[in-house]
């Protein structure tokens, strides 16, 4: 039993029963995954070389069976059968049926007949399906049946056919034939599907050549062929869609954040489950009310006007009362046409974003914002204490303790604006408001700017596609401002001593102090004009060069100087003269001899009113200014809970004694505001409703509407 195998058939089992290879009949050969006998075992028999060794020797020699891809094929002792060790590059067709019998039919490129194979999931190479050419000629690809007939039988097949076959062999052979039939059916289905795809492709190519193919439509963007009105409408629709989804996502994020904050707060409280559930239910009710509010469109008819409390270059501020709730607000009205004509679109958007994005006690709260065809409306909280300019007019000069209090609060307010990513650029006593408890809040962000694209004027210029003539005109105006001649001032060095002011400045006499008081009152009228006042603007802003948040610290130094000295550091009779003094601040910044201030106060002012690269707060921000010795002893965390130096006393919620309402009666409306008012009144008289605005002018104001969530629970709402 363990003798040599030299006299036996290598494919004949010792029992005389046909082996598995003989039972496969006409099935093609497959390369065995493992050798039939161990090499060491064969060497131990001491007989002639084993089949494995013979095959290894034959595979190492080049074969010449007219097979250019298979020089080292396997089983070369069997004629006309070559199985490559490495298959050539193939093209695959995937076939799948409901019985999960999947195959990939692979065909080698540029091969001769008989070299096509089918790769099954089991790794066997099976002959490919029969493919017929469309012209009726026989394809070089042969079917399994054809290949079996054309291939001459091997000596193993002849030997197996001469031997008697057992019933078990017949059953196994029948199963193999059934599998072959199934494979032939699958290949025929794949062939038919490939023929149908080929016919469809040929038909499509023919239709395209005849010019009758209309399966594809080619579009070209040609907005120049459309009218300007159509382009504006398309741009408006695009912005509305973007704003809708942006606001919806933002509201969902805020709603989820409010829920998480309340749950975190309730988890830290030792309350009963019933009380916690009531708090959650109350939040859900508020969310529902706010959702209805967002769907409600506010208008001017929802408010009753009480009186005018402020006027500006582009609008006015009124004291109003909401009809349904009776609460008092300050309504700021801006004329759309002036915003558009005076290139204030970016500033308007920045102001709205600052007020809407801030929930700080140092910034005026915005409750609603809406618009109509002519105006933009900002509904803000009403601060009955007036502004810092009113206090300066009444008290003339502050002590250092009072100045320290208000400057410390201004630092905290400016810090909040900077953390939001904005630059105010217009900090002055007029924009520092006093609340009912005497603490300050920043307002009027009409000149503020941020890092968002909608806060840049170039965004709106591109959006509105301004003509080149207007751009050139603006560039010429800017160039003229840069070419202003600087004043010929004497070359005086400032070694830190307090020198008297220059000859062309205001003299420090009692008579001139009375003139300064007159200047203060006229200063209010200057704020109402379109020119404005440059007393608190940093020099780098005038140069139209790059500047950062440090420009707001210059304004803080100018306000501090005015609180301690009694007038701004560079005040003059005309804005042009003020501009020249600011540009030469090294020579024009002087401290009077008859007014005593501490060394710390003067040092802080000088370190704020200096070049931007050396200015205090440029590198360390607000913390750098807080660390100055002038603010020694200030508790920055509880300063808003400290009693203010001055608390306004009011007789009613509509008391406006701290606002210059008497002066406003003598201030005429701007021509644009007067014309818009006449146009609105005329349209209302004719019962034609509010006049319709130009779609182009409405384009930059998409997304201006806003509603605050906690408008019902704000404690500072009157």
UniProtKB/Swiss-Prot annotation:
Region (Disordered): 1-211, 470-497
Chain residues that bind ATP: 309-317, 332
Pfam family, one: Pkinase
Enzyme class, first EC level, given as a word: transferase
Disulfide bonds, paired cysteine numbers: none
Active site: 426
Skewed-composition ranges (Low complexity): 1-16, 57-68, 131-168, 175-209, 472-489
Domain AGC-kinase C-terminal residues, every copy: 632-716
Keywords: ATP-binding, Kinase, Nucleotide-binding, Phosphoprotein, Serine/threonine-protein kinase, Transferase
Family matches, as PANTHER family: CHROMOSOME UNDETERMINED SCAFFOLD_135, WHOLE GENOME SHOTGUN SEQUENCE, MYOTONIC DYSTROPHY S/T KINASE-RELATED
Family affiliation: Belongs to the protein kinase superfamily. STE Ser/Thr protein kinase family. COT1 subfamily.
Function field: Protein kinase that seems to play a role in the regulation of cell morphogenesis and proliferation.
Protein name per its UniProtKB record: Serine/threonine-protein kinase CBK1
Organism encoding this protein: Kluyveromyces lactis (strain ATCC 8585 / CBS 2359 / DSM 70799 / NBRC 1267 / NRRL Y-1140 / WM37) (Yeast)
